[in-house]
Amino acid sequence: QVKIEVGTGWALYAAPDRLLEKLNRYVENGGCLVATFKTGFANENVKVSHEVQPRILRNCLGVKYHLFTFPKKVMLRGDIVEGTDNREAKVFMELLKLDGAEVLVYYDHYNWNGYAAVTRNHFAEGYAYYIGCMMDQELLKRILMKALEDADIKNIVKEEFPVIVRKGINDFGKSVWFYL
C-alpha cells in the first residue's frame, strides 16, 4: 500500500461526491491536500451544485464562498507574499470566507479586502490548503513548500522545481497523472 503524503486537486471542477468524500477522509486521517479554485464545483456529470461551495470539501478546507470575480488590479498580501516580485491576482478569484481555516493570503483591494485568497486548515489529523485565485509562480511555489512542510517532507526540492510527469491507469481503467 502506498501512502500519499501530499494530494493535490488542481481545479478539480467536476468530481463525483465519493471522490470528494475520500479527499475529506484523506485529510482527516493525516494527509495534506492542496486544492485550487473551482474544486468540487460540479458533479461527475458537470451539474453545478446549488450548495455553498466548496460543498463536500467545505469542512475539510475550512472555507466557503458563493461569489467569484475576475481580478482587475487586485494585489495579494500576507506574510508568505512578502518579497515576491509579482503580487497580483490573475485571471480568476473566488471570494473566500473563513469557516475554520487560517488566512495565508488576503486580497489587497478596497472591494475585496474582507476576503481570503489562500487558506490553510488543520482538519482532524491533517491539513488542507485552498488556493482561491491564479497567482505568480513564485508565490505558488511558496505555498506548495509550506504544504510540503506540513506533510513533513523536507529537503527534497532543489532551488527550482524540476517537474516530472507520469501517466498511468488506475484500478478503474481511468487515466491518472502524477506530477512529481
Labelled PLM ranges:
Residues 6, 11-180:
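A conserved amphipathic helix/loop scaffold
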Residues 1-4:
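A short, well-structured beta->alpha microelement
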